[in-house]
Amino acid sequence: MDSIEEADTSHPQLLHRYLSQNDVEHLYRIFNKRKQLLPEELRTELTDLTGVEFQDEEFQTLFMKINANKDEYCQWDELVSYLILGFQNDDPLAVQESLDLPISQDMGMKLGRQTYPVTKIQYAPLVSYDGTVNWSQGFWVTSTREAVINFWKRDWKHLKTGKAFSVDLKRIKTMVLDTAILPDQNYFCVACLECELRFYDIIASGFTLKTIINRIPNAINSLYYHFSPDTRSKMILGDYVGHVRMIEFFPENKEPFKFDAATAITRMAFCDLVGGLCPQMTCVDYGRLLPDIVRQVEFIESRNSFVACSENDPLVPHHMRNKLQVSLVIQHTRKLDRRTKFKVFKGVTCFAFDSIKDFLVTGGPDGQLRLWDSRRSDKPTEILAGHNSAVVFMFLQDESLKLYSMDQKKIVKIWDVPNRTLIQTYSQFSSSMFKTVPACAYYSELNRELVVGANKVLSVSCCPKIALEVTDGESHTQPISVLLHNPLFKVIVSCGLDSFIIVWDYTGNRKLTIIQDAHTEVIHGILEKVQITAACFDPKLQLMVTGARNGELKIWNFNSGSLMSCMSIGSECEVTAVFWERTGILAMGWNHVIVEFPVGSTGIDFPSGVEWQKLHSDDILCASINRTEPKALASCSYSGEIILWMLETGQAYKRFDAAKPRQKIPVNFKKKRIPQPTRRQTRLSIFQPQEHWRQRRLTRIVMPATAELLRQLTIHNLLFLEARPFHPDYGTLLASLDTGRILVFSHHPDGGYMGAFSAVHMAGDRVIMMTTDSDNRFLFTGTYLGYIKIWLLENYFVPSGKQPKVNRAALRLQFPFLMDDVVPGRAKRSVANQPMPMLLSSYQAHRTCVTDLVYMHASQLLVSASSDRTIRIWTISGRYVGLLGSPVKWPTLDPDHPIARNYNFRIPPDLHREVSFTTAQVLRGGERFIKFKSRILQEASERRRTEAIETYGKPLEPPYLNTATFPYGPHTSYHPDPKLDFSFRQTPIFEHLSIPNLLKMKPVDSEKVLRDAKQLNFSNDGDRIDSYHEKKDNIFK
């Protein structure tokens, strides 16, 4: 625990960075002597040890973080827990931790049902003449036992089909055991049951047999080809009895299979190849290294060694089967004495090796995975059990942090290697393929994709990388439902429908705490996640309560992720709003009633809930609380009724109807049974946008006022303006309707409905979330279509004598939306006849619904959450700062000061090309686009340019010259440049040249031409030209 780096005095709450091991031991002795310390005593000890002078507010915040028991003393366990959490927060892997499962996307089908089952899948990169390898360009190859080889493009479109039949067998069909691609030589190798190797030329569209290596002692079962521009290409061979051999191809002679004009197929015996009679290649026989069929071979270039594995010999006598046999060998290619042997019970069927970390993983027929240190072969470091059948394929990912293994039943398991735990079990392959057909697999490191073939070829993405040119990533795995800001700890807490609770350090884009599966329930014996729908902090901002869709409430210490208490408002009653007051917790939802859980004697224990008077006739959808005196609570139901409650007594004193806001509705204080109306239609989630809204461009449609009043209106959000006085002339309560309008009420007993304004500019859009600053100067609204709008509220529904003056010039400098435009956008046109409240900004922040908004007054930052699973940070003017959880980093933000104007702002990649002009202007900070010509002016310019080029309105037609005036011969046609085919090793140039036929030349009498030239007289040409100009001048005179 020694301090590695110097203490940063700008963050005095990070004690783990200041205290050394000696300091912690000194504190332990003090706590061991005194048992507990008072705040002042702890402050004195920390000041003496660290030398940091704590301010009163800073130390009070620090003590509240340490004091988990919420008493007046600090215990040793509390201090150690706080230091441990600090070290966990500094873990660099906390940012890289993914919330998604390794295989979270849908499975894709590359090829449908095949005639012959696929036994091997390979990918060949493009190798240029200079030896450079381009993995982004290449082709796929699928092999079958029936010797049918199919070649596919990179997008799995068919290229060609080759048949690797034997030229010697007439009636008996061949059986292919293994195949290998030689991409640097454009050859394809086939190992068959006839104990021979066949090499096919696969240049262009051909599949021609060129060379056969026959008379191999045993059939080859495993092939592996390795090529490099700097070293010799190598092919590792493993046969049926455990022999391993290596064939080397010389780099100075890239034609090991030279064309022989005498024979179409070159044949060579394997004994001649081993004896060195073939000058193009050499073969090294390492003998019988394994006891049985070689299952897999692989070459390790960094160690100049190869790895081979096999199962145990099944023909061993019964009394010797318990004896361990050599199942895996690491053999140096040059130094034969450098050989490492691994003995595994029942043998090894497949392996994965990381040469950088010397890390080896083996899988056997017993279904167990064994982790080895390749330098120690006596005992595995760990054994992972989980497969019920033999493991047939595996690979490592992300620097050996994840291990993927597949068994014979086509079940894929993903393991966390450092923690030795199982992350995920993926069984979709087993249900999509025939169970009796064995499967093969290939992992593409370029696309991070696992391709599995049997009777079909299917693929899944394994931890795919984020395309940063398209998106900044995601913050949650499912839509985000709640977003909270804790000013005490200066963090942001987000809750999602994926049942995740994440604590974010928004200043540095880091995940501090992740609570997975926060709410769960058992359905039909399976543990299922429950969506989180509501959350809030306690008055001291140290604890958090969350509400779920099944009616459950949980109390959390969100810093440590520990659960403290559980409650419920009713079975299968979704919690839509929850508030934590000093007297208790208020929760409401689909139970039609407000439930209060009084605070127990310890301040943490909560007895059973007490229901308030039931006045709502339908499910409660939203609520808002006013914590200024007198405290009040507003709740709204699905039918549009708003009820105002006195928070101290729990009595209702006001009631409104959204469809008829001016009508005075008496509050029913009599306890009577209110029948629940039957729903005529299924409710739609705000997190799932309807498809027909995406398929067409929406326009503003104004419905008649009478038609709007006749229908029941749903209220999506309520908001109290707590900074305004409690007076009937002040608008203190806002309610957003389903029509896109916001109603304004006064929650004073003598007040009521005051007015409304339209807050959207797109048909079908509506305000889902509202928030405001601490002074109620601005109103921030988030809409269903992803727009964020900022309104000036300081002079809206305020008495005329109390309205402050509006400095429009200062607002214009702060909000780029207010700049004058040549053609006003739709957002400005929608409020042209609506002078108040003043629209300060409007821009599209998300592609889908905005589910929550948080405004931080000190830093002037606006944080938005959306159903597109992202949390984005904006400035108050609309500039994009970043996305929480994105791999894109940004400079550390100051939580107490606004962002400087010279900050490197960006535009979200998903909004870069598909937003309106108004949104683009706001995201660019007022910078103008290049003014393009309109379509009419552009077409007129093209028309004038066309007229200048063409003649008489159409292009010239041949012949371009008058043959009577210019009696030339026939004009030869245009010959394009030849296109050479460089896919061959030798380019036949003369076959591509277009040579015209030779014509007979007419003989010319050269002597006659010379005589005529001598008779020409040019002496009087100068006088003739002068006389011509004199006549011309006389004419003009």
Curated annotation (Swiss-Prot):
<dbReference type="InterPro" id="IPR019775">
    <property type="entry name" value="WD40_repeat_CS"/>
</dbReference>
<feature type="repeat" description="WD 7">
    <location>
        <begin position="615"/>
        <end position="657"/>
    </location>
</feature>
<dbReference type="InterPro" id="IPR001680">
    <property type="entry name" value="WD40_rpt"/>
</dbReference>
<feature type="repeat" description="WD 10">
    <location>
        <begin position="845"/>
        <end position="884"/>
    </location>
</feature>
<feature type="repeat" description="WD 8">
    <location>
        <begin position="716"/>
        <end position="755"/>
    </location>
</feature>
<feature type="repeat" description="WD 9">
    <location>
        <begin position="762"/>
        <end position="801"/>
    </location>
</feature>
<feature type="repeat" description="WD 3">
    <location>
        <begin position="343"/>
        <end position="382"/>
    </location>
</feature>
<feature type="repeat" description="WD 1">
    <location>
        <begin position="122"/>
        <end position="162"/>
    </location>
</feature>
<feature type="repeat" description="WD 2">
    <location>
        <begin position="171"/>
        <end position="210"/>
    </location>
</feature>
<feature type="repeat" description="WD 6">
    <location>
        <begin position="527"/>
        <end position="568"/>
    </location>
</feature>
<feature type="repeat" description="WD 4">
    <location>
        <begin position="386"/>
        <end position="425"/>
    </location>
</feature>
<dbReference type="InterPro" id="IPR036322">
    <property type="entry name" value="WD40_repeat_dom_sf"/>
</dbReference>
<dbReference type="InterPro" id="IPR015943">
    <property type="entry name" value="WD40/YVTN_repeat-like_dom_sf"/>
</dbReference>
<dbReference type="InterPro" id="IPR051242">
    <property type="entry name" value="WD-EF-hand_domain"/>
</dbReference>
<feature type="repeat" description="WD 5">
    <location>
        <begin position="475"/>
        <end position="514"/>
    </location>
</feature>
<keyword id="KW-0853">WD repeat</keyword>
<keyword id="KW-0677">Repeat</keyword>
<protein>
    <recommendedName>
        <fullName>WD repeat-containing protein on Y chromosome</fullName>
    </recommendedName>
</protein>
<dbReference type="Pfam" id="PF00400">
    <property type="entry name" value="WD40"/>
</dbReference>
